[in-house]
Structure formats: structure tokens, C-alpha cells
Curated annotation (Swiss-Prot):
It comes from Mesomycoplasma hyopneumoniae (strain J / ATCC 25934 / NCTC 10110) (Mycoplasma hyopneumoniae). Residues 16-211 form the tr-type G domain. Residues 87-90 are annotated as: G3. This is Elongation factor Tu. Belongs to the TRAFAC class translation factor GTPase superfamily. Classic translation factor GTPase family. EF-Tu/EF-1A subfamily. Residues 142-145 are annotated as: G4. Residues 66-70 are annotated as: G2.
């Protein structure tokens, strides 16, 4: 992630479009090996710094409101784009990461071992991708080198993957599926290196350029916070909209009734200096006069007076069906789940519209939510509803009450 350390650094190169991407898929299907292979193959072309499996697997821990998430952020380029790539070693880390928005992906690479085919976590990650709004994914069918002469079996696995993607409303018929061997590519075998380059060509062409909200007021969700001795407090996260320049005044909003004003005195991405952070950037910002205790994950840094924290609002929600990973039973008016906004989760209570007694899985309903802590939300803010470690609903704020 972006870390602001010293000023004697190179400037970040903005000549290529910046895209956020990540590897998803079942445990041991080769996500981290593929991440290492992509960086290694592109490094040979001068487009990345090679990262080995161990450095990605020993990912730093990120604290998400008391939840530990291991994530590895690496960067690489193709001829067309600059990519920030997130990989999570643990399955639980993926779930938390995708839900809290730590890995806000413009697209995903789904890794499926051809030796196994789609497995339970393959299905779960596809479902989660749909829930959190990942628009498209490209498939890497891995471990092909272990299936020489088994062409028919590989064809069947490919059909199964396409059907699975279509069942979750992805375009299974047209999703690129690249057959390869991440380990073979990592070991420098030319036929498998070529497949990694083919994969990145597919990512370049199939994953659409996201529409960034540049003209809206600056807002960045705080993902992580740390102190740099002698310089101050740094917050990292993804810029959701707008842009901010060095020495601009901003506010830290959420959890408290009053926002805290501060000035941005440094901006970095991947250890390179920026003059401006803009929508889509995974940036680190140095904040003047802010103590470590004044800011935490789940708050937002925003242009002054553009967003305020709220506890009560009306929302339109969809309760996931049992088959979609939701509840098996209805919920009633004393239900108190967690509501996930951007990088934070807050417990809240619900009130139904008059005449409604319960919500059945599969229902689309309007209801009122009251959170136990004020959060920076506004009309149109999206959230998910979680309980006991699973997503049970998704919603949008329709009207602020207080």
C-alpha cells in the first residue's frame, strides 16, 4: 500500500490508466502462485518488480474494526495500463476484504485448478464478487500441465465454469478463459509464460475502464492508519470520488458528532509521490496535526462540508435467498445485524413500514435503519447486511432521517 516515508522519492507515473484488480478462487487453486507469476513474467519485460510467492504469502495484517485481514498489494504494468493487484492468502480474509471494501476491484481474475474444477469457495467468491459489484472477471484455468492428454476433461471443467458464472449473472458465454500453469510460468517455462501474457492481454481488453467520478467532491474511505515518526499520521485507502491536491484542507468524518479538520501535507501511491490523489487511486495521505487516536478505519476523509455522519436513514434492501448464501428463515423487527459501509461495519436496528411483520429471504423491501454509531452516509450510499460471518442482504440509502 501507499506509505508516506521520505520526500526523496520518484514521482508516480500517471501516463497509464490505473486499474484495481485481484485474484479470487478456491484455496490451493494457485491464486498467490499466479500473482507471483504475473509480476515475474512482466518484470522480464521491465513492467513490474518480481515478487516471489513467500513475499506475497507473508502479507501484512490490516486491522478492519477489530478484524484482522491479511492482504498483499502489488503493482505491475502492461503496455496499456498500470494495475494495483490485491491477493489474500486466507479464505476468511477474502470474505472480509471483499465485504469491507479493502479490495475494491474494477475486475477480478478467477483462478480455478483444472484438476479440481469449481469448488465451494469458487462459488462463494463469484457470489461475493456479484454482491460487491465487481463488473467482470477473466478466468485462469490453472494446473493444465498436470492434465496432459486429458483435453476432454478440461473442456468439461470449462463448460462448468461458464455455467457457474452465468448462474450469478456474469457473462459466462463470453468470459475469457485462459488455460495455463502458474507454477510453470514462475519457473520460467516459455509456453506457460506465454499463457500469463495471454491472460494479461485478456484482462487489458475484457475488463472495462471504470468510470471514475472525478467531478464530485473528494471522498476517501480510511482503510488503515499508522504513524511515521517525525512526520505525523498517515491514512491509506481508495479514493472513491473527486480529487485532492497537496496542502488542501479536508475533514475526517464518522463515529463522532463533529468532523475533524486537517490539511493533506503528503500524498503517495506505491511509495511514489503524487501532487494529486484522484478517484480510483489507492493512496496514502499524510495529515497535519492529526493524532493516531483521532482517526480510524471506517471513517472517511472528505472535502469540507460535503458529507456528515448519520445514524438513522431509510433504505431499500434486498434480502438474499438461501441459494444465494442468505438466511434460511425470515427476520423480524427486533433483528440487529451488522451494516457494512465502505470499510466499516456497524450494528443497527431496523423498523419496518406499517403493515409489514417480517422480511422473507428473496424480498425487496423498504425499511428504516438506526445505527449505534454515526457513519458518513448520504442518499445513494450502498451497504451490505451481514450476520454470523455471512452476507444476508444488500441495500442502498434512500433518505436521511438524522
Amino acid at each position: 500500500m501507499a506509505v508516506v516515508k521520505t520526500t526523496g522519492k520518484k514521482d508516480f507515473d500517471r501516463s497509464k490508466e490505473h486499474i484495481n484488480i485481484g485474484t479470487i478462487g478456491h484455496v490451493d487453486h494457485g491464486k498467490t502462485t499466479l500473482t507471483a507469476a504475473i509480476s515475474t513474467v512482466l518484470a522480464k519485460r521491465g513492467l513490474a518488480e518480481a515478487k516471489d510467492y513467500a513475499s506475497i504469502d507473508a502479507a501484512p495484517e490490516e486491522k478492519a474494526r477489530g478484524i484482522t485481514i491479511n492482504t498483499a498489494h502489488i503493482e505491475y504494468s502492461t503496455d496499456k495500463r498500470h494495475y494495483a493487484h490485491v491477493d489474500c492468502p486466507g479464505h476468511a480474509d477474502y470474505i472480509k476484504n471483499m465485504i469491507t471494501g479493502a479490495a475494491q476491484m474494477d475486475g477480478a481474475i478467477l483462478v480455478v485448478a483444472a484438476t479440481d474444477g469449481p469448488m465451494p469457495q469458487t462459488r462463494e467468491h463469484i457470489l461475493l464478487s456479484k454482491q460487491v459489484g465487481v463488473p467482470k472477471m477473466v478466468v485462469f484455468l490453472n494446473k493444465i500441465d498436470l492434465l496432459e492428454g486429458e483435453e476432454e476433461m478440461v473442456d468439461l471443467v470449462e463448460v462448468e465454469i461458464r455455467e457457474l458464472l452465468s448462474s450469478y449473472d456474469f457473462d459466462g458465454d463470453n468470459t475469457p478463459i485462459i488455460r495455463g500453469s502458474a507454477r510453470g510460468a514462475l519457473e520460467g517455462k516459455p509456453e506457460w509464460e506465454a499463457k500469463v501474457l495471454e491472460l494479461m492481454d485478456a484482462v487489458d481488453s475484457y475488463i472495462d475502464s471504470p468510470v471514475r467520478e472525478m467531478d464530485k467532491p473528494f471522498l476517501m474511505a480510511v482503510e488503515d492508519v499508522f504513524t511515521i515518526t517525525g512526520r505525523g499520521t498517515v491514512a491509506t485507502g481508495k479514493v472513491e470520488r473527486g480529487q485532492v491536491k497537496l496542502n488542501e484542507e479536508v475533514e475526517i468524518v464518522g463515529y463522532r458528532e463533529e468532523p475533524k479538520k486537517t490539511v493533506i501535507t503528503g500524498i503517495e501511491m506505491f511509495n511514489k509521490n503524487l501532487q494529486t490523489a484522484m478517484a480510483g487511486d489507492n493512496a496514502g495521505v499524510l495529515l497535519r496535526g492529526v493524532d493516531r487516536k483521532d482517526i480510524e478505519r471506517g471513517q472517511v476523509i472528505a472535502k469540507p462540508k460535503t458529507i456528515i455522519p448519520h445514524t438513522k436513514f431509510k433504505a431499500a434492501i434486498y434480502a438474499l435467498k438461501k441459494e444465494e448464501g442468505g438466511r434460511h428463515t425470515p427476520f423480524f423487527k427486533n433483528y440487529k445485524p451488522q451494516f457494512y459501509f465502505r470499510t466499516t461495519d456497524v450494528t443497527g436496528g431496523i423498523e419496518f413500514e406499517p403493515g409489514r411483520e417480517m422480511v422473507i429471504p428473496g424480498d425487496n423491501v423498504d425499511l428504516t435503519v438506526e445505527l449505534i454509531a454515526p457513519i458518513a452516509v448520504e442518499q445513494g450510499t450502498k451497504f451490505s447486511i451481514r450476520e454470523g460471518g455471512r452476507t444476508v442482504g444488500a441495500g442502498t440509502v434512500t433518505e436521511i432521517i438524522k
